Amino acid sequence: MSRILVAAALALAVGSVGTTWAQTQSTAPTTDAGTKLNFPATLGGATFERVVNYAAPPANRADLGSSYFYSTPQKMVITVQVFDGGRRVPPGSTSPVVIGEFTNELDSVGQQIQGSGYTNFQRPAVPSSCTYGSVTFRCITYSAITQANMRVYSKLLLTGYQQHFVKIRIDWGQSPQVQHTSADADAALQAFIPALFR
């Protein structure tokens, strides 16, 4: 995958909670304290890259939890953010709390894409439900064109689990050299998510 594509995917991956590079990071695999979800060195074929703890300085935002970054053998980026948003989160994907947070996430994505110099932001008008293993999420796939004239895609998933939000996003791109599809992303998620919730 070209460096431009990797940079574009990483830009989308870090966008939803601000600049993660300035936060406390670690490359050591870990277990999330609130949900007991385990983030090992390899998960469903994807390789652990790093964890960002937003509760630590300089952010000091415990409500934003932590983000765990993985890369797939196909060079797609999977990000898992576990957070509570400062409230108790009901289980599943259909509660008003989860629906409201999903709407907020989509609004934030739209604003960040506009501010990033990307163009031609596309997303369905209505999100859907996606089930991976035994877990159902609210989900949507969106895309935009980078300044390098490459279309990049993200699939955003959100559910409530153990009184926390679990937000998963997979990012991929299409260029003359790389032709990932939504089927490739779904195959990666079908391996990754059941392993995460095991």
Task: Locate each region found by the language model.
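Positively charged n-region of N-terminal signal peptides that target proteins for export
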Residues: M1-I4
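Bacterial N-terminal signal peptides
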Residues: A7-S16
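Sec/Tat signal peptide C-region and signal peptidase I cleavage site
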Residues: G18-A22
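Short, surface-exposed beta-strand/loop micro-motifs that present aromatic residues
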Residues: Y68-F69, V152-Y161
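N-terminal "mature-domain start" segment
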Residues: Q23-Q74
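Surface-exposed amphipathic alpha-helical segments
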Residues: K167-R198
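A short acidic-to-branched-hydrophobic micro-motif
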Residues: G65-N104
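Signature of long, low-cysteine stretches enriched in small and polar/charged residues
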Residues: Q111-L156
